[in-house]
């Protein structure tokens, strides 16, 4: 999605400013300095909009482009080199914005968020769930000659209140619950949930859990996110940095995580950061940017 670095904050936007103050936090002490570990230099990937590291294939990362592309996902190695291009069976890319992955009894599954709505013109959205293909090394596949995934399951949903734009999709590794976080230029992001056991034969209605802010201005302009493999941490990003929240040990359920104070994680220079993911072992975070030859950034836990 096109973005200008000049963000207008109106004089009457006191709610946004108050939320920023409430969410103010210091830089996380849990992570080392960010480092560039490679470059996503394939001409087929000019806008890396979603990113995951596979728990079934730890040496493989997956990404996709933003709107304007066909229904492709791309396998990368851990330096950003493209290994394969896959066409997702039965899927359409109107505005893909984020990517999640979950290890299930039948294998690992990619969850692709058809959740963008910049013009607020859509009321129904889709998360495509497709079994992760096996990647055995670099292939000669391309957009003109792609490999194929199995047919994707289309999980349709609507919001309970209004037509949101969103760029953050999360799937809990243990429960399979799906979370969508709205993207707002002014005010808090809204956290929505679709409990596991959803019906793919109908349009499911999300449940609003809470509002959520990060220590930035704007404080709800979220562009990507990920849940850690152990299900105890969430990282989200805006265009410039990342923010992590941690589930308290005494928490009775996962949704208590949204009440926690975000800690900022520096990601270094990104032209337009829209993708972030925990490493498969949970010991690092990967990030990319919507730009040609995007750097692949890694931030390791101390």
Predicted regions and their residues:
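C-terminal motif of bacterial Sec signal peptides marking the signal peptidase cleavage site
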Residues: 3-5
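Sequence/structural signature of beta-propeller domains
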Residues: 7-302
């Amino acid at each position: 999605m096109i973005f200008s670095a000049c963000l207008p904050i109106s004089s009457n936007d006191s709610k946004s400013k108050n939320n920023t103050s409430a969410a103010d936090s210091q830089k996380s002490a849990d992570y080392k300095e960010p480092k560039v570990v490679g470059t996503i230099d394939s001409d087929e990937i000019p806008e890396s909009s979603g990113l995951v590291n596979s728990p079934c294939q730890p040496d493989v990362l997956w990404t996709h482009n933003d709107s304007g592309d066909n229904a492709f996902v791309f396998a990368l190695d851990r330096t950003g080199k493209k290994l394969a291009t896959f066409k997702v069976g039965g899927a359409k890319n109107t505005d893909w914005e984020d990517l999640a992955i979950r290890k299930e009894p039948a294998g690992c599954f990619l969850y692709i968020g058809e959740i963008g709505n910049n013009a607020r013109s859509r009321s129904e959205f889709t998360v495509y769930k497709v079994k992760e293909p096996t990647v055995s090394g670099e292939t000669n596949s391309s957009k003109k000659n792609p490999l194929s995934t199995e047919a994707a399951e289309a999980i349709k949903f609507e919001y309970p209140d209004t037509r949101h734009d969103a760029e953050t999709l999360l799937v809990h590794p243990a429960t399979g619950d799906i979370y969508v976080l709205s993207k707002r230029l002014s005010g808090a992001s809204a956290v929505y949930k679709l409990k596991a056991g959803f019906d793919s034969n109908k349009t499911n209605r999300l449940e609003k859990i809470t509002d959520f802010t990060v220590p930035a201005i704007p404080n709800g302009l979220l562009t990507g996110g990920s849940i850690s493999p152990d299900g105890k941490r969430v990282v989200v990003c805006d265009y410039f940095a990342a923010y992590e929240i941690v589930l308290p040990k005494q928490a009775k359920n996962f949704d208590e995580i949204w009440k926690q104070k975000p800690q900022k994680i520096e990601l270094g220079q990104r032209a337009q950061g829209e993708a972030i993911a925990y490493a498969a072992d949970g010991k690092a975070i990967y990030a990319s940017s919507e730009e040609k030859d995007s750097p692949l950034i890694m931030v390791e836990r101390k």
